[in-house]
Regions:
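Short, flexible helix-loop junctions that flank or precede catalytic/ligand sites
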Residues: 2-382
């Protein structure tokens, strides 16, 4: 490990990205394939991700399923030579200090990508996400069209939640695109990294990348509040300071869109509260009850054809009834309120899964494997 740290230190001081060695760009999972060739290979097979780990060939994720390539196992030099040329000196310093880094990069004639470079068993590893070039629509994502109404709101906090890889960023991009097509609004996004690049139409859109344009979410969000934006997108609410500022922004005339890592809509309320000291939670609960506009919890579920994946969504709209329950601390009643809120655009995850089964998009066993409350789902399926 010390030898590798010394190597990183030397690279920080001596990096010359204008003249990378042939060796650094030629070694990949398939004999002498370059990173560009590997990524083009992955894109041609419809992969969403490429995973590089020492001791295994490059692995593709296609329709949610991992598929190893036929190349030989990667060694430590393979991964280093593929990944380190992507990094600026400051990013190498961050990798050395934090042992992990996220960044976006573009390969000409290949595409746009997001990569997480990290360490495992004393060696570099990487997970590369292939980014679509087209901004998705709610329809192309197979999400309810009613979600488009959230993009028309003038203020409030809209949260998209779910596990990693469930499409949260794509959902946010679709909502921003609706704003861009319908409103003369000033939109500012804070992302780590920027994944979808929006072109100005009706709106003016600024996209700020953490690590390149700003040090972190919280600092930038405070600064943005002085720039009179109409819509703010925070890629992820990672800490109490960011959450508090986002709630304040949503209360004071801004539409704020963000994400959390929770499985369902109700957990989003608890997740925010638990980020604050107990003494502050009553005040934060009041803020949530006033600022929250909606929570969209989603997951991608394998289709009945074995190829496609379909989004199952739990949607909680902040109606007067929902706000009252949050304000009083009756979070245990929120799910019941969601289940009877179809007229307001709400549904539970089990109701969404049942709809997918009835539409012959997923089978019953798959729905049962992805539900949170088995008895509820069985009741909806009949």
């Amino acid at each position: 490990m010390k030898e590798y740290d010394n190597e990183l230190s030397d690279l920080v001081a001596q990096l010359n990205r204008a003249a990378p060695s042939n060796k650094a760009t030629a070694r990949a999972s398939q004999s002498t394939a370059s990173l560009d060739e590997l990524l083009a290979f992955a894109g041609g097979r419809g992969a969403s991700d490429v995973v590089l780990i020492v001791g295994a060939p490059a692995v593709l994720r296609v329709n949610g399923t991992l598929a190893p390539t036929s190349g030989p196992p990667l060694d430590a030099e393979d991964v280093r030579s593929l990944m380190l040329p992507l990094l600026e000196p400051s990013q190498l310093e961050e990798l050395q200090k934090k042992r992990s880094i996220d960044l976006g990069f573009v390969r000409e004639r290949v595409g746009r990508f997001r990569v997480n470079i990290h360490h495992q068993r004393g060696t570099l590893a990487a997970s590369i996400r292939l980014l679509p070039t087209q901004i998705p629509s709610l329809d192309s994502l197979h999400l309810p069209a009613t979600l488009g109404k959230l993009a028309e709101r003038r203020q409030g906090l809209v949260l998209v939640t779910g596990p990693t890889g469930c499409g949260k960023t794509s959902t946010l991009a679709a909502l921003i695109d609706i704003v861009n097509s319908r409103r003369a609004a000033h939109v500012v996004t804070i992302e780590d990294p920027v994944e979808y690049q929006h072109e100005n139409r009706s709106a003016i859109i600024e996209q700020i990348e953490v690590g390149r344009d700003t040090p972190d979410f919280a600092v930038t969000l405070r600064s943005i509040m002085r720039q009179t934006p109409d819509v703010i997108l925070v890629g992820e609410m990672r800490d109490a300071e960011t959450m508090a500022t986002a709630l304040t922004a949503a209360e004071t005339g801004h539409l704020v869109l963000s994400t959390l890592h929770t499985n369902d809509a109700v957990q989003a309320v608890a997740r925010i509260l638990d980020s604050f000291p107990a003494a502050n939670q009553p005040q934060i609960r009041q803020q949530i009850s006033l600022a929250l506009a909606a929570v969209i919890a989603q997951q991608l579920v394998p289709g009945i054809d074995g190829v496609s994946r379909w989004p199952a969504t739990e949607i909680m709209i902040a109606t007067d009834g929902i706000r009252a329950l949050i304000r009083k601390g009756d979070d245990h009643q929120l799910r019941s309120q969601i289940s009877v809120g179809k007229a307001d655009g709400m549904m539970t995850m089990e109701q969404s899964l049942a709809e997918l089964v009835r539409a012959n998009r997923i089978d019953r066993d798959t729905a049962l494997a992805h539900c949170f409350r088995t008895e509820d789902l069985k009741r909806y399926l009949g």
